Amino acid sequence: MEKMSRPLPLNPTFIPPPYGVLRSLLENPLKLPLHHEDAFSKDKDKEKKLDDESNSPTVPQSAFLGPTLWDKTLPYDGDTFQLEYMDLEEFLSENGIPPSPSQHDHSPHPPGLQPASSAAPSVMDLSSRASAPLHPGIPSPNCMQSPIRPGQLLPANRNTPSPIDPDTIQVPVGYEPDPADLALSSIPGQEMFDPRKRKFSEEELKPQPMIKKARKVFIPDDLKDDKYWARRRKNNMAAKRSRDARRLKENQIAIRASFLEKENSALRQEVADLRKELGKCKNILAKYEARHGPL
């Protein structure tokens, strides 16, 4: 029995014309997709997906499945939680870290001849670093009490203040002397006495002895001649001048003493205020030294 071959269905586009198969292939070549073009298109799709993933904001996932550190809360007990003091200069020197960024190898001064002023910023920087809190949730206890702010530096060279003349210091004293007392304390025809500026010498302020009057000598009337009366008038004028000068000096000293009493009370009040302020400063300094050590 002979096998019959079944005719295959042909695409009418591939049916060669009657005038030749070769000519039809040359005129209408068959275009098939190449393997390397498919691979190139797949690579481009992969790169596009990677670019999309890199541009999208994704949160990196950790491989650790336990609880994170920031989700925990530290147990804080005021009795057991204590801050220990650490010497920052020793810590930085052990780790080879310079105390301040200003101390580099390209410093214009040699290492042995550096000015003493360069040490001041480093100390202040270390003190500002020491005042920082050890934990972000616990603020530093001296953040409101420390007079030194972060980044604030003391002047390197402190100029010594010039001495003050005590005579130029004026204390506000509410003292207004009586004009009548000033008139009694001033010499007629001269400048008015000022108890604020007038100063007496040590000799003037010494106690004066009591002057006893001379014993009266009885002189009979027949001996009282013109020479006697002239001498008598002269002695009376001298005694009057002496009494007036002594009374004037006593009045001046009395007014001056009254002014000094008022000035003394004002100075005592000012000294009391200064001592109170000094006590507060000493307390703040003692608390600072207790936390951060002596300055």
From Swiss-Prot:
Keywords from the named record: Biological rhythms, Chromosomal rearrangement, DNA-binding, Nucleus, Proto-oncogene, Transcription, Transcription regulation
CDD domains listed in its UniProt record: bZIP_HLF
Induction of synthesis: Accumulates according to a robust circadian rhythm.
Annotated tissue distribution: Highly expressed in liver; lower levels in lung and kidney.
Listed Pfam families: bZIP_2
Chain intervals with Basic and acidic residues compositional bias: 37-52
GO biological process: positive regulation of transcription by RNA polymerase II; regulation of transcription by RNA polymerase II; rhythmic process; skeletal muscle cell differentiation
GO (cellular component) term, any one: nucleoplasm
InterPro entries: bZIP (IPR004827), bZIP_sf (IPR046347), PAR_bZIP (IPR040223)
Region (Basic motif) location: 227-247
Segments of this protein annotated with the region Disordered: 37-70, 93-167
Keyword Transcription regulation: yes
Localization, UniProt: Nucleus
Region (Leucine-zipper): 248-255
Domain bZIP per the UniProt entry, residue ranges: 225-288
GO terms assigned for molecular function: DNA binding; DNA-binding transcription activator activity, RNA polymerase II-specific; DNA-binding transcription factor activity, RNA polymerase II-specific; double-stranded DNA binding; RNA polymerase II cis-regulatory region sequence-specific DNA binding; sequence-specific DNA binding; sequence-specific double-stranded DNA binding
UniProt entry tagged with the keyword DNA-binding: yes
Disease entry from the Swiss-Prot or TrEMBL record: A chromosomal aberration involving HLF is a cause of pre-B-cell acute lymphoblastic leukemia (B-ALL). Translocation t(17;19)(q22;p13.3) with TCF3.
Family, as annotated: Belongs to the bZIP family. PAR subfamily.
PANTHER family: HEPATIC LEUKEMIA FACTOR, THYROTROPH EMBRYONIC FACTOR RELATED
Subunit structure: Binds DNA specifically as homodimer or heterodimer with other PAR factors.
Record protein name field: Hepatic leukemia factor
Organism of origin: Homo sapiens (Human)
